Amino acid sequence: MNEPAMNRSEGRAIFGLDASDYDIARMGYPAQLYDAIAARTGGSLAGRSVFEIGPGTGLVTRELLARGVERLVAVESDPELARLLSALAGGGDRLHVVNAPFEDADLGVDRFDVACAAASFHWLDTAPSLAKVHAALVPDGTLALWWNSYRNPHHGDLFAAAVLPLMAGLSFPPFQSAESHGSHDERFWRGELIRAGFGSIDHELVRAERTLTTAEVRALFGSYSFIRRLDREARERLLDAIALLAEREFGGVVPNVALTASYLCTAGPR
C-alpha cells in the first residue's frame, strides 16, 4: 500500500521509548465497539477470558478489566510498555502480561473466548498471526481488530490534506501511506479473515470530528511511529513545520477527522 515501508520490528520498538506521551491528543475507542464485542459473548465480557495483542499503554486493557473480564493475557513485545502494563491498577490476578512478540508468545493451553488487537495488527505478519489467533480461541470465539486513524484527507479532513506535502519522502508503517490507512481496506481484511477460518464478519467505520490546538496537533504527529523514528533534528524540524502550518493556515484551530475501523468475527470450525 505504500513505499517505502517501515520494518515491522523497528515499529514495535518505537513506542516504548516515550510511552508517557503516546496517548496525548489521541482518542479512546467508541463504547459501542466494546458493546459489540460483549454482544458476541452473550451480552457481557464479565467472566470471559481474553487475550490482547499489542496493548501498548493499556488503553484497551483498562477498559477490558473495568468490564469484568476474568482472565486477561496481554501480549506486549516492548519491555518498557510491558513493565507499565504489569503495574496497572485493578489488574491483580486477572491480568497476566507476556513480554514477547506475538509470534513467539506462549498463550498457555487454555483457549480464550475473545482476542483483541487495537492499532497493532499491522505490525504482524497477517496470515500466520491470524492462524495463531484462530488456534487460541474456543470454537465460535470472537476476534476483534480495530484501529483509529487521524489523517484522513479523503474523508473531509482539511488539515490532513494540507499537511500532505510535508509527508513526502517518509517511510510509513505497513498498510499505511501519507494519504491512506490500511484499516479502511475492507476487501483485504475480509479476505484474510475468511482464509484464516473466521466468519460472521462485521465491519464498521465510525467517524468522529473534533478541533485541536496547535500544541495538540504537534503532539499527535509527534506520536506517530514514522515521525518518532527520525533523528532528533529531523523530527523537530518536521514538527515545527507542521505546527507552523496549523498556526498560519488554520489559526491554531485545527479540524481533525478521526475514523475508527473495526472488524469483528467468529472463529469457525478447525
Spans of features found by a protein language model:
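Conserved Class I S-adenosyl-L-methionine
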Residues: 183-270
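Conserved catalytic/acceptor-binding region of the Class I
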Residues: 134, 138-208
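Conserved alpha-helix/loop element of class I SAM-dependent methyltransferases that forms part
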Residues: 28-47
